[in-house]
Structures are given as C-alpha cells and as structure tokens.
Amino acid sequence: MSLLIEQARYHLSAHNARQLPDDGGYEVAFAGRSNAGKSSALNALTRQNALARVSKTPGRTQQLVFFQIQPERYLVDLPGYGYAKVPQDLQAHWQAFIDRYFRTREALRGLVVVMDIRHPLKDYDLQMLGYAAERGLPAHGLLTKADKLGRGQQMQTLQKVKKEVTSRFGDSVTVQTYSGQSRQGVDELRGIVGGWLGLIAEPLAEH
C-alpha cells in the first residue's frame, strides 16, 4: 500500500466545480487551518518532499489540488482556511465551493482534518468534521506538531480531543498524534488513508 501512495503525482487544480475530475472512484480530502501542517503531512504521507507546496504565506492555497495515485484514486488538498487576510469575497467563494464539494461529491470516501495539537478543534475544524458527519463519511483528526509537546501532554490532548469528537460525531471520527519532524504517526495515517482509497483491506483505526 505504501508504495502505491508514493506514486501520487499532481493531476490538476480546480478553482470551480466545472474543473473537478469526473466524479468516480475514490478520493480522500485533506483540510486544515492555514499553517496547521497540511502540506507537510501530505508530503510525508507520500514520501515526497515537494508534492504539496509548503507555503510561507498563510491562506495562499486557494484551489482544490488533486494528486493522482492511480486512475480514479486521488488525494485532494483543500484550501487552507481561517486566515483573516484572505478577502471576504474570496472566502465566500471558497466556502460555497467547498460546501458543494462535500455535499455532492460521490467519490469522496473520507476526510483528514489537520490540526495543530496545541490548538485543536477550532470552529473551522468542527465545521469540516460536521460536513463529513452530515454525509455519513469517516473523518480522521490529525494532531500535528506533536513534537512541540511532551509525551504526557500529547496523550492528554489526544484523549481530550477524542472525547470531544465522540460526543459530537459518534465513532465516525478517529484521532491520532503526528509529527513531521520525528515522523511519529506516519504509518498510522497511511493505514487510514490507504483503507479509504481501497488500497488495503481495512483501514487502521484508533478510537
């Protein structure tokens, strides 16, 4: 499975619904607040240093970027959200586009919500998880930058987030800690994503 994930290549960028690929197969979307580490996580997942651009300008990713693993199997990088310098009209456009994507995209099989472990479950994160819950899709909370906390703090935050998402969304959301620096949690993330993409028999899940 990991070798297949590593075959991911840039396919296209969509600024509106007309530019999306045909709605078939399997897609896993990655969402996260600006600078939560979403691009870095995609790069670690695929073992590629520059698959997803790591922008130094928060909020710069303003398109849906599709990375193709196999025909009809994609990783989808959603626009970073929650950055005040993005103009209001552009924020409204992306809100409507993403809303339509989540509500109508049949190929979407799961959502990874990337959150800085020091600031998890902000309003936008909960909104993304809510989209998945409304569609009956599984979601996975990726608590990034875990190396910024001690092991005890990591586990405390992990348990707190698990409790919160379970109370809100039931058992459709799994959660893990992750560090791009130490590569902590990369294999667990691959198990989840590979399962949703149909690349392995069952996704690894930690509730």
From Swiss-Prot:
One of its GO terms (biological process) is division septum assembly. Residues 24-199 form the EngB-type G domain. Transmembrane segments: none annotated. GTP binds at residues 32-39, 59-63, 77-80, 144-147, 178-180. The keyword Repressor does not apply. Its cofactor is Mg(2+). Mg(2+) binds at S39, T61. PROSITE patterns: G_ENGB. The keyword Ubl conjugation does not apply. Keywords: Cell cycle, Cell division, GTP-binding, Magnesium, Metal-binding, Nucleotide-binding, Septation. GO terms for molecular function: GTP binding; metal ion binding. GO terms for cellular component: cytosol. NCBIfam families: GTPase_YsxC. Necessary for normal cell division and for the maintenance of normal septation. HAMAP family: GTPase_EngB (MF_00321). Belongs to the TRAFAC class TrmE-Era-EngA-EngB-Septin-like GTPase superfamily. EngB GTPase family. This is Probable GTP-binding protein EngB. It comes from Xanthomonas oryzae pv. oryzae (strain KACC10331 / KXO85). The lineage of its organism: Bacteria, Pseudomonadati, Pseudomonadota, Gammaproteobacteria, Lysobacterales. The gene is engB.
